[in-house]
């Protein structure tokens, strides 16, 4: 399925967040309080982005991660929208808006907080990794 077809399958919120650089409501989203073992992939491209092993409760109202699974799968861009100075995070392949990265994460884990919109992600549970084509990430959970 090509990107155009995948975009047609997104919900209104998923499209707003990933394609229009939107932000979903804090604390009222799918993955803020979700801590099952597995990985989070780009809702548009399916590329692996984050692991539950790097997720933590930052209290910000959105899923927070200390790092991406593979740094090369995300891009960072200086963002001055809404009168703020911050760093936007996008998926490399689909160019989906994911959220922002801030330098206030746990210092013992690198000091970064990837604050990511749930609407930009799809969760793949550890037990489904092999069947969904992400078997190479099973080793993360051993």
From Swiss-Prot:
Example GO biological process: protein repair
GO MF entry, a single one: peptide-methionine (R)-S-oxide reductase activity
Name by which UniProt lists this protein: Peptide methionine sulfoxide reductase MsrB
Gene3D superfamilies: Peptide methionine sulfoxide reductase
Highest taxon listed in the record's lineage: Bacteria
Keyword entries, A-Z: Oxidoreductase
Catalytic activity: L-methionyl-[protein] + [thioredoxin]-disulfide + H2O = L-methionyl-(R)-S-oxide-[protein] + [thioredoxin]-dithiol
Positions annotated as active site in the UniProt record: 115
């Amino acid at each position: 399925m090509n990107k155009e077809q995948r975009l047609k399958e997104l919900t209104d919120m998923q499209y707003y967040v990933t394609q229009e650089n939107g932000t979903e409501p804090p604390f009222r989203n799918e993955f803020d309080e979700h801590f099952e073992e597995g990985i989070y992939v780009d809702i548009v491209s399916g590329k692996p982005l984050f692991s539950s092993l790097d997720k933590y409760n930052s209290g910000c109202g959105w899923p927070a991660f200390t790092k991406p699974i593979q740094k090369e799968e995300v891009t960072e861009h200086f963002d001055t929208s809404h009168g703020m100075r911050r760093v936007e995070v996008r998926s490399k392949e689909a160019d989906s808006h994911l959220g922002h990265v801030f330098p206030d994460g746990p210092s013992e884990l690198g000091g970064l907080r990837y604050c990511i919109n749930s609407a930009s992600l799809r969760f793949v549970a550890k037990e489904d990794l092999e069947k969904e084509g992400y078997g190479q990430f099973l080793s993360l959970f051993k």
